[in-house]
Curated annotation (Swiss-Prot):
Organism for this UniProt entry: Ruegeria sp. (strain TM1040)
Catalyses which reaction(s): RNA(n) + a ribonucleoside 5'-triphosphate = RNA(n+1) + diphosphate
Name under which the protein is recorded: DNA-directed RNA polymerase subunit beta
Cleaved signal peptide residues: none
Organismal lineage: Bacteria, Pseudomonadati, Pseudomonadota, Alphaproteobacteria, Rhodobacterales
Pfam families in the record: RNA_pol_Rpb2_1, RNA_pol_Rpb2_2, RNA_pol_Rpb2_3, RNA_pol_Rpb2_45, RNA_pol_Rpb2_6, RNA_pol_Rpb2_7
Length: 1379
């Protein structure tokens, strides 16, 4: 029986109690799906109109010329096959991209001069090349100029309408000034705002403000229309004897004290006396009885009201009062009415006056006051006003003003709300416009102002701009779409001009288009956009996290300086969408976030998180994804709510979230429940076991530091994990997964060949070859190396891990090592978080990592002649050339040190004029060495290691040297091996099928020696015929003959395809390289160095506990346990209480218990090897994993599988304790007891130096520690002499510039304080910027003398020059010293 791969898996004991109904989505789905939608390649459905790249073309095309006699239309687009694959692009420093071909149609019209009618004269279609479009690799990255980059998703404010206030900060009175802003996806912003006097203003694009009524006039409303839109009308009818009768609304008087008696108009009864408060009970009574419909108000009460409509004299059309005018009465000294607009109306016989329903309590007169202040009265003057604000200094005309206003908000080319913006606006203002209505309408603007005025009247709430319903994500596809649109618009202008200037009848679309601007826009985006980042490739986790990052910075986003506290803070809507823990420390805190584990981005760009549906108090397995806005309507319980067997809530009151508040709610009101406790946090945070026991600040550091862990020489999965290590290793692409099920056919360190057994399609050879990446350099100079996990003959299922990558162990993420730690001080060496380590750690390469540096040298064609890469270097001894081959390039495997030559290179130098004698000697001896200088590539100071790879690139047509040819031969051999393997498997597959087809059939005729009508048997096939002759057998059955024919055709076609692919690859290898201009040849050398753990290296746990190694102590001096085991690390116990990351202690205890259980299994295996009895092994496994797991998976294993599974866990039984649902204190105690340890988790330790027992028990256990990418080797640096700054002549600073130590202002004070005059003088002159002095010092040191003289420092000369720059001539005079 072929042994399956399952037995090799390491079993983890899972401590989670909550059943998860939903698998975690693919971790890099955000990137992949977004870019697939943009390009519409791969499995994405065919392009819909208006989406992706097709939508971009459709928004720019058709392009008409200025006379509209011709049109260029977009028909379709297609991406061709990329020229180079991912690996080739990375090796050649190229961009992984595919050529984009666009089909365009040029239509030329004939225009009738008399009628102006158009008729089609000519139509031409053509495919036009539009530049290269970068493709995404299967891991969600882009290869740009040979380096892997990630496009980070951006969080920005969603388009739509937002209401806000200034929090009382603008005006000294602290009054809230409300504002409203309409933000489009692209186009002009429109703001409406109140000022301190309660006048409403509008601003376009943050320019000068205008009264809002000006904008409404420009939209075509008149005064009456405006008043009608914003106010209800109330009629005042005059009853001669009693006063005015007006409608009565009881709600409006609730809580007020009327200034006059409220009198029922029908009965004359007083409902409420003046000055008495109207109670809510009285109002309810009035509403219930419903018999009071009209009030009688005093005659004077109408004064101060505003007229709702123009009141006109019917006979002559004269206006008595205009809409919005205030009603007035004028009295004489005796109190008699002598004038005013009310008297005028009454005199004209008008007793029914419509007034605006403004009571200054529920409805304020803001719009009416604004209108009164506005000097404009008509559309024309309003448009002119807007034009003056938008185009100051230009003389306005009505036509120009009208055209400008239309293009601002109503032209789809200039203004786009986007579908999101329209949906948000419809929801906020309760409108019902179609999604496709992407520009503003008159109704939208009117509704916005109405909502703003209602806010001022105290109705409704302002929006919270940090709510995730108001922030959306722009992923790769959308960012790219916007960038491409910019490029096409630049191109559009050029096309229009060209269409008008050329003879349009004779040109093809190709002649009109210059694709450079579009290609440049794409290149600029990938090369230099703030969101296109160099991928963080330290380890697989850092890759995944980088792809899931959400940044609020970048073009169109925030800037660090302007972002306040609110934007950075955690918001209730982040729950399950963005991680509240993982964010950088420092100026970017809260602006750069990480997507939560289960979150996804919907088609509108809002982040959604999944919930299980609760129906009638029962939790179902139905899962709904909800955006933050949808979630506000629901009551959501937490995943850890207690449920019984029927999935019903046990408790009557359940802890829930309701519209941003955390409350206890009755269980029947709950309608959703979280799918998992870890949906709250990001991937990095969910890798921290016992996260629930850590302080949030430390958890933040823990999440961030896991991303800096360096891949070690031998990866080791954590004993105490959380169960998602496997998912991260799988989705990051670090480990290799089988694409389809099959049998392992061949295997070596470089590749795995699998014979596929499923998903076979017609014409498919059924061979999968997986090439492993061997010792490749990552972006962070760490080492990418993959190792096979499988053996020949094993069967693998689709999606199984067949090879481990960097920082993965048996398909699980493994960032560090499990080591024995003791929390105890040791002679002060763990003061301030320092770490003491045992020599065993350094000796056994426990924390050793490999780092690969890349060195590059180019031979250019200079003005004086070409540079040359050669072994023949002037004035260099044979010793220095020992590592170079005959071509002058270092050989692979050479150990190199600082100063060693890697590639020999000579550069011609300028000829100095020669004397005739020199010319003669030159002619006789052919001496050439003098006119070249040595510019070889040497190893930098502080670098050392082993050469692991050399690549040579030659320009087209340049002759290749021996080394380049050798590399080429090796590459071709490798390709040939792949082809031969594929052919071999193809042959075996085809001939096996052919054999099954032929056996037992009758052959009518065949090759020589086969008689007619022979029954085909095994002897005939194996002994009489060669395999090639099998095809010549003609079968009796017509159907069989057809199958044979089809099989033969398929075989030949596959062989041809294989050969063509091989030829294509070989041609690419042999073809010259595209090098930058002027470069003839380029050599890259890769040097690998092993970095052992040493003092000064930074280490950390997963709980934010970090420290620097202070000392390496011999193993025999370390504290040891009673059985003689020395501990590996001593950590400071004082680092725990104040930091409140107790999770590390629980992890230490749990790891200790896991190690103990592993040792028990090891003992059982020893017994088995002695006695052959499996029972102790089964018992030990049952005890370690518990009855459930044992019955489910282990009891059914056969002997080999069980021994293999047990052998995998002898160093400790791996456990998984998921975040917020992991092992509790009782579980830790129970595990310690089962492992045979004390419940306290503490052990007696002995001092390694004296052998004495320590005074009290010490916490000892297994802890997972990481070595971080802050290595002392990269930081330590020394300089004797080196480069100087040009102006000040002082040494440069920093390791990268090979700089010196800064002796700054404060250090000078220190020497001054000690009176160390001579030392100070040296520091400020000869050791710094006294140019003449330092040269003399150097010379005197060489001669062995010890006297020197300090001169004038160069910085003093700089000061003199600056003073002269101010116009003051300052000179240094050499005064003769008088005795």
């Amino acid at each position: 029986m072929a042994q399956t791969f399952l037995g090799q898996k390491r079993l983890r004991k899972y401590y989670g109690k909550i059943r998860e109904v939903l698998d975690m989505p693919n971790l890099i789905e955000v990137q992949k799906s977004s870019y697939d939608l943009f390009l519409r390649s791969g499995d994405a459905p065919q392009p819909l109109d208006g989406e992706g790249i097709k939508g971009v073309f459709q928004s720019v095309f058709p392009i008409k010329d200025f006379n509209e006699t011709s049109v260029l239309e977009f028909v379709n687009y297609a991406l061709e096959r990329p020229k180079y694959d991912v690996d080739e692009c990375m090796q050649r420093d190229m961009t992984y991209s595919a050529p984009l071909k666009v089909t365009l149609r040029l239509i030329v019209f004939d225009v009738d001069e008399d009628t102006g009618a158009k008729s089609v004269k000519d139509i031409k279609e053509q495919d036009v090349f539009m530049g290269d479009m970068p493709l995404m690799t299967p891991n969600g990255t882009f290869i740009v100029n040979g380096t892997e980059r990630v496009i980070v998703s951006q969080m920005h404010r969603s388009p739509g309408v937002f209401f806000d206030h200034d929090k009382g900060k603008t005006h000294s009175s602290g009054k809230l000034l409300f504002a409203c802003r309409i933000i489009p996806y692209r186009g002009s912003w429109l703001d409406f705002e109140f000022d301190a006097k309660d006048i409403v203003f509008a601003r376009i694009d943050r320019r000068r403000k205008l009264p809002v009524t000006t904008l409404l006039y420009a939209l075509g409303l008149d005064q009456e229309g405006i008043m009608d839109a914003y106010y209800n009308t109330v009629n005042f009818k005059l009853e001669k004897s009693r006063g005015w009768v007006t409608p009565f609304f009881p709600e409006r008087v609730r809580g007020t004290r009327p200034t006059y008696d409220l009198v029922d108009a029908a009965t004359g009864e007083i409902i409420c006396e003046a000055g008495k408060k109207v109670t809510p009970r009285a109002v309810k009574k009035m509403i219930d009885e419903g018999n009071i419909t009209e009030l009688l108000v005093p005659f004077e009460h109408i004064v101060g009201k505003y007229v709702a409509k123009d009141i006109i004299n019917e006979e002559n059309g004269a206006i008595y009062v205009e809409a919005g005018d205030e009603l007035t009465l004028e009295y004489d000294k005796d109190g008699d009415i002598i004038g005013g607009s009310v008297k005028e109306l009454l005199d004209a016989g008008i007793t029914d006056i419509p007034v605006l329903d403004i009571d200054n309590v529920n409805v304020g007169p803001y719009m009416r006051n604004t209108m009164a202040q506005d000097k404009n009265m008509s559309r024309e003057t309003a448009l002119m006003d807007i034009y003056r604000v938008m185009r100051p200094g230009e003389p306005p005309t009505v036509e120009a003003a009208s055209a400008l206003f239309d293009t601002l908000f109503f032209d789809s080319e200039r203004y786009d709300l986007s579908a999101v913006g329209r949906v948000k606006m419809n929801m906020r203002l309760a409108l019902d416009a179609e999604d496709t209505q992407r520009t503003l309408r008159k109704e939208d603007i009117v509704a916005c102002i109405k909502a703003l005025v209602e806010l001022r009247d105290g109705k409704g709430d302002v929006d919270d701009i940090d709510h995730l319903g108001n922030r959306r994500v722009r992923s790769v596809g959308e960012l790219m779409e916007n960038q491409y649109r910019v490029g096409l618009l630049r191109m559009e202008r050029a096309i229009k001009e060209r269409m008008s200037s050329v003879e349009i009848d004779t040109v093809m679309p190709q002649d009109l288009i210059n694709a450079k601007p579009a290609a440049a826009a794409v290149r600029e985006f990938f090369g230099s956009s703030q969101l296109s980042q160099f991928m963080d490739q330290t380890n697989p986790l850092s890759e995944v996290t980088h792809k899931r990052r959400l940044s609020a910075l970048g073009p169109g986003g925030l800037t660090r300086e302007r972002a306040g506290f609110e934007v950075r803070d955690v918001h209730p809507t982040h729950y399950g969408r963005m991680c509240p823990i993982e964010t950088p420390e420092g100026p970017n805190i809260g602006l750069i976030n990480s997507l939560a584990t289960f979150a996804r981005v919907n088609k509108y760009g809002f982040i959604e998180t999944p919930y299980r549906v609760v129906k009638d108090g029962q939790v179902t397995d139905e899962v709904h994804y909800m955006s933050a806005t949808e979630e506000m309507r629901h009551t959501v319980a937490q995943a850890n709510a207690n449920l019984d067997e029927d999935n019903r809530f046990v408790n009557d009151l359940v802890s829930t979230r309701q519209s941003g508040d955390y409350t206890l709610a009755p269980n029947e009101s709950v309608d959703l429940i979280d799918v998992s406790p870890k949906q709250l946090v990001s991937v990095a945070a969910s890798l921290i076991p016992f996260l629930e026991n850590d302080d949030a600040n430390r958890a933040l550091m823990g999440s961030n530091m896991q991303r800096q862990a360096v891949p070690l020489l031998r990866a080791e999965a954590p004993l105490v994990g959380t169960g998602i290590e496997e998912i991260v290793a799988r989705d990051s692409g670090a480990a290799i997964m089988a694409k389809r099920a099959g049998v392992i056919d061949q295997i070596d360190a470089q590749r795995i060949v699998i014979r596929a057994t499923s998903d076979l399609e017609l014409g498919d050879a059924g061979v999968d070859i997986y090439r492993m990446r061997k010792f490749q350099r990552s972006n962070q100079n760490t080492c990418i190396n993959q190792r096979p996990l499988v053996k020949v003959g094993q069967t693998v299922e689709k999606g199984e891990v067949i090879a481990d990558g960097p920082s993965t162990d048996m398909g699980e993420l493994a960032l560090g090592k499990n080591v024995v730690v003791a929390f105890m001080p040791w002679n002060g060496y763990n003061y301030e978080d320092s770490i003491l380590i045992s020599e065993r750690i350094a000796r056994d390469d426990v924390f050793t990592s490999i780092h690969i540096e890349e060195f590059e040298v180019a031979a250019r064609d200079t003005k004086l002649g070409p540079e040359e890469i050669t072994r023949d270097i002037p004035n260099v001894g044979e010793e220095a050339l020992r590592n170079l081959d005959e071509a002058g390039i270092v050989y692979i495997g050479a150990d190199v040190e600082p100063g060693d030559i890697l590639v020999g290179k000579i550069t011609p130098k300028g000829e100095s004029p020669m004397t005739p004698e020199e010319k003669l000697l030159r002619a006789i001896f052919g001496e050439k060495a003098s006119d070249v200088r040595d510019t070889s590539l040497r190893v930098k100071p502080g670098d050392y290691g082993t050469v692991v790879e050399v690549r040579v690139f030659n320009r087209h047509g340049v002759e290749k040297d021996e080394r380049a040819l050798q590399i080429e031969r090796e590459e071709v051999e490798r390709l040939a091996r792949d082809r031969d393997d594929e052919l071999g498997i193809l042959d075996r597959n085809i001939y096996a099928r052919l054999r099954d087809l032929l056996l037992g059939k009758t052959a009518v005729k065949g090759p020589k020696g086969v008689r007619g009508n022979t029954v085909i048997d095994e002897d005939l096939l194996d002994n009489q015929l060669t395999r090639g002759q099998w095809w010549m057998l003609a079968l009796e059955e017509e159907q069989d003959a057809q199958i044979l024919e089809a099989l033969n055709e398929q075989y030949e076609a596959q062989k041809r395809a294989l050969d063509a692919r091989f030829e294509d690859k070989v041609e690419k290898v042999r073809r010259g390289d595209d090098l930058p201009p002027g470069v003839m040849k380029m050599v890259k050398v890769f040097i690998a160095v092993k970095r052992k753990l040493q003092p000064g290296d930074k280490m950390a746990g997963r709980h934010g506990n970090k420290g620097v190694i202070s000392r390496v102590v011999p193993m025999e001096d370390m504290p040891f346990l009673a059985d003689g085991t020395p501990v590996d690390f001593c950590l400071n116990p004082l680092g725990v209480p104040s930091r409140m990351n107790v999770g590390q202690i629980l992890e230490t205890h749990m790891g200790w218990a896991a190690r103990g259980l592993g040792l028990k299994i090891d003992d059982a295996l020893q017994d088995y090897r002695r006695t052959g009895d499996l029972t102790p092994v089964r018992d030990a496994m049952r005890e370690a994993y518990g009855e459930d797991v044992y019955e489910e998976g282990i009891s059914s294993m056969d002997e080999t599988q069980l021994i293999e599974a047990a052998g995998n866990v002898t160093r400790g039984v791996p456990i998984a304790t998921p975040v917020f649902d992991g092992a509790k204190e009782d579980d830790v105690n129970d595990a310690l007891v089962r492992a045979g340890f004390d419940q306290s988790g503490q052990s007696i330790l002995f001092d390694g130096r004296t052998g004495e027992q320590f005074a009290r028990p010490v916490t000892v256990g297994i802890k997972y520690l990481l070595k971080l990418h802050h290595l002392v080797d990269d930081k330590i640096h020394a300089r004797s002499t080196g480069p100087y700054s040009l102006v000040t002549q002082q040494p440069l600073g920093g390791k990268a510039q090979f700089g010196g130590q800064r002796f700054g202002e404060m250090e000078v004070w220190a020497l001054e304080a000690y009176g160390a005059a001579y030392t100070l003088q040296e520091m400020l002159t000869v050791k710094s910027d006294d140019v003449a002095g330092r040269t003399k010092v150097y010379e005197s040191i060489v001669k062995g003398e010890d006297n020197f003289e300090a001169g004038v420092p160069e910085s003093f000369n700089v000061l003199v020059k600056e003073v002269r720059g101010l116009g003051l001539n300052m000179e240094l005079l050499d005064a003769e010293v008088e005795e």
